[in-house]
UniProtKB/Swiss-Prot annotation:
First-listed, main subcellular location of the protein, grouped into a coarse class: membrane
Cystine bridges: C97-C189
Domain of life per record: Eukaryota
Database matches in Gene3D superfamilies: Rhodopsin 7-helix transmembrane proteins
Protein name, UniProt field: Olfactory receptor 5L1
Cellular-component GO terms for this entry: plasma membrane
Residues exposed to the Cytoplasmic side: 47-54, 121-139, 218-237, 293-311
Source species of the chain: Homo sapiens (Human)
Gene coding for it: OR5L1
Topological relation to the membrane, as annotated: Multi-pass membrane protein
Keyword Membrane attributed: yes
GO BP, sorted A to Z: G protein-coupled receptor signaling pathway; sensory perception of smell
Keyword terms: Cell membrane, Disulfide bond, G-protein coupled receptor, Glycoprotein, Membrane, Olfaction, Receptor, Sensory transduction, Transducer, Transmembrane, Transmembrane helix
Amino acid sequence: MGKENCTTVAEFILLGLSDVPELRVCLFLLFLLIYGVTLLANLGMIALIQVSSRLHTPMYFFLSHLSSVDFCYSSIIVPKMLANIFNKDKAISFLGCMVQFYLFCTCVVTEVFLLAVMAYDRFVAICNPLLYTVTMSWKVRVELASCCYFCGTVCSLIHLCLALRIPFYRSNVINHFFCDLPPVLSLACSDITVNETLLFLVATLNESVTIMIILTSYLLILTTILKMGSAEGRHKAFSTCASHLTAITVFHGTVLSIYCRPSSGNSGDADKVATVFYTVVIPMLNSVIYSLRNKDVKEALRKVMGSKIHS
């Protein structure tokens, strides 16, 4: 691409998920419904954990942070995506694009580490129940959660600082529904080898470390479950672990497929569809899998609703 086609940009144009007019209403209603459920479930979960004393445990401490992160990064992306479905002007300012990417990246990396911490928490609870409250003390919980947010912030700052150094772009049209880094980098005129290499290395390192923690934790949990004498206890534990691993597999699978591979130079429709799963669907599924299927949460919700009705 010749240098004469390169220029600075003041704004980007987000193409969105589809340019087929007949799909606009269906897409809008579908994602509005998913976003509504996501907000209600995650904010409701946070509130329930705060008001219910029986949920003041390490597991629900981390679950409240997961709900907060899911709420945040879904809200960073979905409202703008919904607005762009019907808007002819799909522009987002350069600054707005960078801010959206930074906040999104911070939340996603935080969730990557938070899911690993939650897997470790389940390992301690099931495999070492007598030491659970000591091992996962308030101080330890705060330190682990803080580390997750710190890793998310640092990784995002690295990518943001490198992205801000790109002087010229050959186009301002992003083939995506939000400002993700790979499609933005594909528009750069300058050499982005460092950007792409760091994106690959950081994502691969984060994924490798956290997946290893998750797999090790659940393997040890599985070993403990198989030793249980109660068939009902085994079934309940298997069901819980299977649902957790399903959500984790979908989340990490899409992250791996998009960020932990050599750059293809563009963001195709397959990438956009895959991205929908961990930016829109997973925040909703997490609230269902980690909370609505949980007996303690159901009991706490029933107690809170009962007290409201009788008051």
